[in-house]
Amino acid sequence: ERAVNADPKLDGLIGFKDLKLEEMGWEVYDFLEPVIIDDIAYSHYFTSGVMGRPVSSAKLMLQKKYMSCVMGHVQDRDVAFARKADGTNMLGLFAGIFYQHDEDYLTPQTNGSWSGIWILNEVKDGGCDEMPVSINYLREKYGD
């Protein structure tokens, strides 16, 4: 869509279907369509209200969405925890980045942010035990 928006001549010539992701077994969702798996919602980002802007913190995401949520979009990682009245644990997670390099569009304050992946263990009813794994650890263990 971004290429077509930048150059309308491409409209109808290229699209996500050309990538044949579904034919290769991928589940494909529309941008910002939350995907809920085991009572945890996943999205590129979650909105803070009717203006459609991204939430600014993991804590605010829990307050706005009332369920465990994991999102990308921002360079820094952020984690928040809450508990529902019924005792169910909730996780709010900004996943951060997985860059091995600095990005030109980032500032000196945001280049160098933590970079890695998250493993969600013991996922059940929206709760889990989150485990960060840094890119540095992965590179040391498995090589460049």
Predicted feature locations:
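Active-site neighborhood of divalent metal-dependent phosphoester bond hydrolases
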Residues: 1-29
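Solvent-exposed, charged interface segments at domain starts and junctions
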Residues: 5-8, 31-32, 49, 53
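Short, conserved active-site loop motifs that form the nucleotide-linked donor/cofactor pocket
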Residues: 25-27, 40, 90
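Short, acidic/polar N-cap/turn motifs at the starts of alpha helices
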Residues: 30-34, 117
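Beta-strand-turn-beta hairpins that frame and shape the catalytic cleft
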Residues: 34-41
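Conserved beta-sheet core of the metallophosphoesterase superfamily
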Residues: 43-131
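Polar, enzyme-active/binding microenvironments
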Residues: 129-144
